[in-house]
Amino acid sequence: MSIFPTRDSRDLSSRRRSLIDWEFPQMALVPLDQVFDWAERSRQSLHDDIVNMHRNLFSLEPFTAMDNAFESVMKEMSAIQPREFHPELEYTQPGELDFLKDAYEVGKDGRLHFKVYFNVKNFKAEEITIKADKNKLVVRAQKSVACGDAAMSESVGRSIPLPPSVDRNHIQATITTDDVLVIEAPVNEPNYKAIKLSPEKGLAIQPSEVQERQLAVKNKEGLEIVTAEDGSKKIHLELKVDPHFAPKDVKVWAKGNKVYVHGVTGKEEKTENASHSEHREFYKAFVTPEVVDASKTQAEIVDGLMVVEAPLFK
């Protein structure tokens, strides 16, 4: 299925401002307090946000370079057999997959959306075609320019990984007046109750506080890869958490092929003659052999043990 972009009468800055200046619908599936918090902090950092968006635009490249770039990304996402995978020995640097951390936002329909941006300067909307398949999003642009009696053809494109949770039947694409192609689509059935949005960490998950566990416990601290009967894979992470940390004090998020866990809590007591403050914090990072589908992450804390599960995708 091909998607053809339409023209937007606004530039990227105006479009971004409209996203955070409208009244969020009461039927929003993302918890409203989180939506308002995300919107307020986004308003405060709007200028920096726009600068970063322009800096991180995907560029279109000649087809050969495009294929090589996607092949490089897919190698970065290649699976490693669980028995050969040792997270403590792995080391990764920021790469092309890091865009996934910031690729989720609340849409005007109150749902979680996957959204990416491309630089399409010098191309018209009718010269651009977008296709989505099982594991990637492909943008192609082609035009011919008359040069005397001859015609020169320019063909460029870009492929990026597309999470399986993205609703491929509702992908929309628009081009702003400053030549930015915006592609977005809702996410299928994300874990709305646990979602936490922030400009700093992007999409994060807050562990649930449950009386009875929904996730299996293996009593083996650390991260491992579990393969289901249908061949799909997911991470299973168990981590002991100090009793001082409530579920609301802990956040889990993914960036590229790493999963991060951050907990912070504190209290301040004041009397007439003295004051006392207490601050506790921990930070953990785990490398995964593939990329985590962050919108489908589940996490819970019971009796000081946190369990996290999230599907992987290639």
Curated annotation (Swiss-Prot):
Domain of life: Eukaryota
Disulphide bridges, residue numbers: none
GO molecular function: unfolded protein binding
GO cellular component: cytoplasm; nucleus
Domain sHSP residue range list: 95-200, 216-314
Alphabetical GO biological process terms: protein refolding; response to heat
Compartment list: Cytoplasm
Keywords per UniProt: Chaperone, Cytoplasm, Repeat
Family of the protein in this entry: Belongs to the small heat shock protein (HSP20) family.
Subunit structure, as described in the record: Homodimer and homotetramer.
Extra remark beyond the main annotation: Not precipitated by antisera from cattle infected with T.saginata, suggesting that the protein is not accessible to the host immune system.
Function: Has chaperone activity towards unfolded proteins (in vitro).
Name of the protein in question: Small heat shock protein p36
Source organism: Taenia saginata (Beef tapeworm)
